[in-house]
Amino acid sequence: MKACAYAKDLDYIDADINARIQDMRIVTKVSLSDEEAEFDGKSLTTEQMKVLLKYYETCQEPRRKEFLEMFFFAFHACGLRVVDVMTLQWSHINFDKKELRKIMIKTNKRHVIPLSEPAIRILRHWQEKRPDSKYVFNLVKEDLDLDNAEELYRCRNNATKCINQSLNVVGEQLGLDFSLSMHVARHTFAIVALNKGLSMTVVSRLLGHGSTDITEKVYAKFLPETLAAEVARISPELNQFVPTIQ
């Protein structure tokens, strides 16, 4: 795999071909069950997201601002898990196709995510900051061995703890009654997507869930807006068949 990446750097093989070869890499699956803990309803409302964005724009602490950029990237990258934000490489990004192609650490499956303009803007910003880096975000060492499960698990825990501690301070300053974390970005994306009418199947694929059963179990009970909207949409048809009650 390293030889293919080197060949790509020397323009011996096409970047798309290299990306597909890298997708074939078999890694030891890391136990990350705690990362997909039962959803407890902690997500940000539209107004809270606006307040958080305003906080970011006025933040004077460089590292905290970087963590907020990672939070917003995870949100705009279809709820990308923190471990995949942490291990995201420039080789996973195709700016021309506006997509992210990566083997997800938790599922060990190839996943393709369409990149929105906000996500691309964040990536371009980090590309300017770290033009010669392997990893997009400065959360792990450049020589991190993704095939070393223990090292990956340790790095994931350290990075998550560091980011979430900083985000939690932000949440407290904004008056949130729960801990702000990277996983909140994932849940917020899912809730927004479902309430905007995306099907459970589509959202499940974007989140990288193994099946829609997982998505339904976690999110279905938090979707009264979507259910009400769907009923309202078909009401004109249903109302044709109302019996006259005497």
Give names to the regions the model predicted.
Residues 104, 142-143, 207-233:
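Catalytic-site neighborhood detector that most strongly recognizes the C-terminal catalytic loop/helix
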Residues 114, 121, 126, 221-246:
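DNA/chromatin major-groove-contacting recognition/catalytic segments
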Residues 38-42, 107-125, 133-169:
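C-terminal catalytic core of Y-nucleophile DNA break-rejoin enzymes
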Residues 15-82, 86:
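Basic, Lys/Arg- and aromatic-enriched nucleic-acid-binding interface segment
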Residues 92-99, 177-178, 198-218, 246:
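Short, polar N-cap/turn motifs at the start of nucleic acid-interacting alpha helices
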Residues 1-22:
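N-terminal DNA-binding recognition helix of tyrosine site-specific recombinases/integrases
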Residues 72, 76, 80, 186-210:
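C-terminal catalytic core of tyrosine-transesterase DNA break-rejoin enzymes
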Residues 131, 139-150, 232-246:
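C-terminal secondary-structure termini that scaffold catalytic or DNA-interacting sites
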